[in-house]
Amino acid sequence: MIPIVVEETGRGERAFDIYSRLLRERIVFLGEQVTNDSANRIVAQLLFLEAEDPEKDIFLYINSPGGSVYDGFGIFDTIQHIKPDVHTVCVGLAASMGAFLLCAGAKGKRSSLQHSRIMIHQPLGGARGQATDIRIQADEILFLKQKLNTELSNRTGQPLSKIAEDTDRDFYMSPSEAISYGIIDNVLNKKPVSVL
């Protein structure tokens, strides 16, 4: 069930689902696995916010175990393509494609909450069928692995050889370790409270 937010306006009350209300504040939330549906939704929201105001930053909050590499690249490429800077924030877990998208934010604007976890690894896949079909799938996975590792190297500043070694198995990081690694730029603590 998606929570509904009721807002008072000059013309009465107006109800929004929580995600629509967050979108009005230029906040996009990825709180699930990266699939074709979730990626299309995120891409559409990013494009909408760019059309609404190409100068104003967008915030992408990520709590995702990962998912489809192809669909994740769709989100990644859109983040790179649009004019507004995208702040990425890990809330909970950014694993696999979730970590890749966390790293996709504008330099200096990639963050994590203090108790979140970040995990990178190589793409997963399964193939069945004839030997030639299995080879085609294996070649594609190796291609995607190289592409992901190259992008991670470019975004983090880590040598490609280190990325390849670290992604060979699940590689978990705390937010401070992710800063050292170059995946994020800072850890968000409590927002300052303004006193009137």
From Swiss-Prot:
Primary location: cytoplasm
GO molecular function, one term: ATP-dependent peptidase activity
Source species, domain of life: Bacteria
PROSITE patterns: CLP_PROTEASE_SER (PS00381)
EC number: 3.4.21.92
Location relative to the cell: Cytoplasm
GO CC annotations, alphabetized: cytoplasm; endopeptidase Clp complex
Record bears the keyword Hydrolase: yes
SUPFAM superfamilies in the cross-refs: ClpP/crotonase
Keywords: Cytoplasm, Hydrolase, Protease, Serine protease
Enzyme class per UniProt: hydrolase
Residues forming the catalytic site: 96, 121
Any one Gene Ontology BP term: protein quality control for misfolded or incompletely synthesized proteins
Job of this protein: Cleaves peptides in various proteins in a process that requires ATP hydrolysis. Has a chymotrypsin-like activity. Plays a major role in the degradation of misfolded proteins.
Family note: Belongs to the peptidase S14 family.
Oligomeric and partner information: Fourteen ClpP subunits assemble into 2 heptameric rings which stack back to back to give a disk-like structure with a central cavity, resembling the structure of eukaryotic proteasomes.
Protein name according to UniProt: ATP-dependent Clp protease proteolytic subunit 1
Native species: Prochlorococcus marinus (strain SARG / CCMP1375 / SS120)
